[in-house]
Amino acid sequence: MEGLSSCATNYRISSGRWKKVGTISRYFYDSWAILEYLNTGRLAGYFRSTRGLTTWLQVMEVFYALLRDGRSESEARDLVVALQPHLIDFSFDDVLGAMILRIRMARKRRNLSYVDAIGYYTARKRGLQFLTRDPGFRGLPGVVVP
C-alpha cells in the first residue's frame, strides 16, 4: 500500500486529522488508547505532543469497535486511514516472541489477547512506552495507563 512504511514519519492527530510535527516516536498506541482519544478526546496530550506508532492489528480492532459502536463505514474508514503513517510492521520472530510472552503472562494469571501480546511485545522490543487504558496492563514494565 502506498504511504505505509516502517520508518517514523512525524504526524499528530488534531480534530480527526493527522498533522505534521517535529517529534520522535515515543509511544505505542494500543487500540484502547486510540479509541479513548477518538471517542472522548482524553489522552489528547499523548497524541498531540508526542509521536506514537501502532500496528495494523490495533487498527483492525479500532475499525471493528468504531463500526460496532455505531460509526458509519465511511467515518470509521476515514479515522483508521489517518493511522497509516503511524503503522509499523512486525516479523515472524516477533510473533513467536509475543506468543512466548503471552504464555508467560498467562502463567501469572494475566490473559493477553493475541493482538495485545503482539502490541506489547512490539512496544517493548522497540523501546516504546505502551499507551493503553486497558486495566489488565497496570503494573507491567513500560506501560502507561493514564
Where are these regions (language model features)?
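Active-site-proximal, substrate-binding regions of enzyme catalytic domains
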Residues: 57-93, 99
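Short, well-structured N-terminal submotif of metal-dependent ribonuclease cores
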Residues: 1-55, 65-78
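A generic hydrophobic-segment detector
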Residues: 125-146
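Active-site regions of enzymes building and remodeling cell-envelope glycoconjugates
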Residues: 50-54, 85-86, 140-146
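Alpha-helix N-cap/helix-start capping motif
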Residues: 32, 56, 92, 134-135
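Active-site neighborhoods of divalent-metal-dependent phosphate/nucleic-acid chemistry enzymes
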Residues: 4, 11, 15-18, 88-129
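A generic structural signal for short hydrophobic patches within well-formed alpha-helices
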Residues: 34-35, 59, 137-138
